[in-house]
Swiss-Prot record:
The keyword Magnesium applies. Homotetramer; dimer of dimers. Its cofactor is Mg(2+); K(+). Pfam families: S-AdoMet_synt_C, S-AdoMet_synt_M, S-AdoMet_synt_N. Gene3D superfamilies: 3.30.300.10. It comes from Methylibium petroleiphilum (strain ATCC BAA-1232 / LMG 22953 / PM1). This is S-adenosylmethionine synthase. Its EC number is 2.5.1.6. The keyword Plastid does not apply. GO terms for molecular function: ATP binding; magnesium ion binding; methionine adenosyltransferase activity.
Length: 393
């Protein structure tokens, strides 16, 4: 990639229909794990106007009121009025869960290459990434895109901007100079709102636009990056119909929002609703943990990790490190350090990151990475000193 360029990432709010589905799936996972952390869960959710469908595979000894969990999640998000297209009190909730296939379970319970270990729940490839663009070691465009929609929800819920409704999207286009963030070229923020905020179908009131820029955008973005920045606020105009009424929502359809905003490749597997024997989730968390510790150790300015697994096999097929020329030692040496310092077998990941806990609903909106939440063990940098010492730095 050239040293001077524009790069864009987007995020969506907790009220976006796909994120409603993700949060319901992870709320159900948490409710199950609170009773039986050894459960196998693959909880999928569909949301539409006045309707929630829960489907997937669950094997558990827990007794969970799935319908109530779905309603409670919708209420927390803010869909509490029939005018919004879905209302937690009156929406229909259909439940269609089955048990995990015995054919899958036998390979997960006992790995073919290590009978004392857990096999991967499926084949696949996962990526982790970290860079020094923000203190959280995340790419700046996705980090700030998340913070914009997070603030939209905050001001909606605390009543400071009472005309806001739950659905919203953000997009940040960053200008890079010499490969580093220099300024923000464009900010797009589209938010659902009450009907009185538009002058016409295609034009918002000036007071609405001003409130979004002054109360949501400017308090979040670094002032020094706002140099001739363009602001596009509800650029299509009126946005009253939104959420599951505006679009059908599905679990696992915002995988780039969930990760790095396109700054690195994605293996294709979604996270929400999956217990950590599913390496789509747990190995992606572990790869972030590895990459973040390498950057925190000062061994690279940016670091991409790829791991891959075969179903029923514990050990990863590969551990590949790519630092795009920013590493202080060769990438193959970093890969050997990773293999020495991190147990990337599924059971090792679960133990290393303490993943058999009801911690997942919080991950399902505003990004799984780059948030200093106490439950997010994959954001720790506790291996940085050991990696630095092992690298002789």
């Amino acid at each position: 990639m050239a040293n001077d360029f524009l790069f864009t990432s987007e995020s969506v709010s907790e009220g976006h229909p796909d994120k409603v589905a993700d949060q319901i799936s992870d709320a159900i996972l948490d409710a199950i794990f609170a009773q039986d952390p050894r459960s196998r869960v693959a909880a999928e959710t569909l949301t539409n106007t006045g309707l929630v469908v829960l489907a997937g595979e669950i094997t558990t000894n827990a007794h969970v009121d799935y319908i109530q969990v779905a309603r409670d999640t919708i209420k927390r998000i803010g869909y509490d009025n029939t005018e919004y297209g879905i209302d937690y009190k009156g929406c229909a909730v259909l439940v269609a869960y089955d048990k995990q296939s015995n054919d899958i379970a036998q390979g997960v319970d006992q790995a073919s290459d290590d009978h004392l270990n857990t096999g991967a729940g499926d084949q696949g490839l996962m990526f982790g990434y970290a860079c020094d663009e923000t203190p959280e070691l995340m790419p700046a465009p996705i980090y700030y895109a998340h913070r914009l929609v997070e603030r939209q929800a905050q001001l909606r819920k605390d009543g400071r901007l009472p005309f806001l409704r739950p659905d919203a999207k953000s997009q940040v286009t960053m200008r890079y100079v010499d490969g580093k963030p220099h300024s923000i070229d464009t900010v797009v923020l589209s938010t659902q709102h009450s009907p009185d905020q538009s002058e016409t179908a295609k034009k918002m009131k000036a007071s609405f636009t001003e409130a979004i820029i002054e109360e949501i955008i400017k308090p979040v973005l670094p002032k020094e990056w706002l140099k001739d920045t363009k602001y596009l606020i509800n650029p299509t105009g009126r946005f009253v119909i939104g959420g599951p009424q505006g679009d059908c929502g599905l679990t696992g359809r915002k995988i780039i929002v969930d990760t790095y905003g396109g700054a690195c490749p994605h293996g294709g597997g979604a996270f929400s609703g999956k217990d950590p024997t599913k390496v789509d989730r747990s190995a992606a968390y572990a790869a972030r943990y590895v990459a973040k510790n390498i950057v925190a150790a000062g061994l690279a300015r940016q670091c991409q990790i790829q791991v891959a697994y075969a179903i029923g096999v514990a050990r990863p097929m590969n551990i590949t490190v790519y630092t795009e020329g920013t590493g202080v030692i060769p990438d193959d040496q970093l890969a050997r350090l990773v293999a020495e310092h991190f147990d990337l077998r599924p059971k090792g990941i679960i133990q290393m990151l303490d993943l058999l806990r009801p911690i997942y609903e919080k991950t399902a909106a505003y990004g799984h990475f780059g948030r200093e939440e106490p439950e997010f063990s994959w954001e720790k940098t506790d291996k940085a000193n050991a990696l630095r010492a092992a690298a002789g730095r």
